[in-house]
Amino acid sequence: MKNDITFYTRFQQDILAGTKTITIRDESEAHFMPGQRLRTGRYEDNGYFCTLEVLRVTPVTLAQLNEEHARQENMTLAELKKVIADIYPGINELYVIAFKKVEG
C-alpha cells in the first residue's frame, strides 16, 4: 500500500515518540486537510511506520520560522533553518503541517 507522506528515517523516532509534531513542506504537499489520516513511511525505503492525523496546515515564510516551530520539530532554530535550506533550497513560501500520531 502506498504511503501518503514520507519522512527521512532520521525523523522516525521523534515522530513515534511524539516529540516531532509538525513538518514543514513546500507547496506540492500543502494539500492535506485537517482531520485527514496519512499513512506515513520512510523516504529512503517507503516502509510504513505509523498513521498521522493532520491537525492544521498553515502557510509560513522562511523568515517567519521561530523557536516554537523548532521546538515542534524537536531541533534548534538554527538546525531547522539548515534542514529546510538543504531540502528546499531557494524556496521561501512553505507550509507547516501540524499532526498527531494515531497508530503505530
Curated annotation (Swiss-Prot):
Domain ASCH residues, every copy: 6-102
The enzyme's E.C. designation: 3.5.1.135
Residues the record marks as active site: 20, 23, 73
Gene Ontology cellular component list: cytosol
Catalysis: reaction(s): N(4)-acetylcytidine + H2O = cytidine + acetate + H(+); N(4)-acetyl-2'-deoxycytidine + H2O = 2'-deoxycytidine + acetate + H(+); N(4)-acetylcytosine + H2O = cytosine + acetate + H(+)
CDD domains: ASCH_yqfb_like (cd06552)
Keyword list, A-Z: Hydrolase
Function: Catalyzes the hydrolysis of N(4)-acetylcytidine (ac4C).
Pfam families on file: ASCH (PF04266)
Family assignment from sequence similarity: Belongs to the N(4)-acetylcytidine amidohydrolase family.
PANTHER family (UniProt xref): UCP029143 FAMILY PROTEIN
Full protein name: N(4)-acetylcytidine amidohydrolase
Highest taxon listed in the record's lineage: Bacteria
SMART domains: ASCH
Molecular function terms from GO: hydrolase activity, acting on carbon-nitrogen (but not peptide) bonds, in linear amidines; N4-acetylcytidine amidohydrolase activity
Source taxonomy: Bacteria, Pseudomonadati, Pseudomonadota, Gammaproteobacteria, Enterobacterales
EC top class named in words: hydrolase
Family matches, as InterPro entries: AC4CH, ASCH_domain, PUA-like_sf
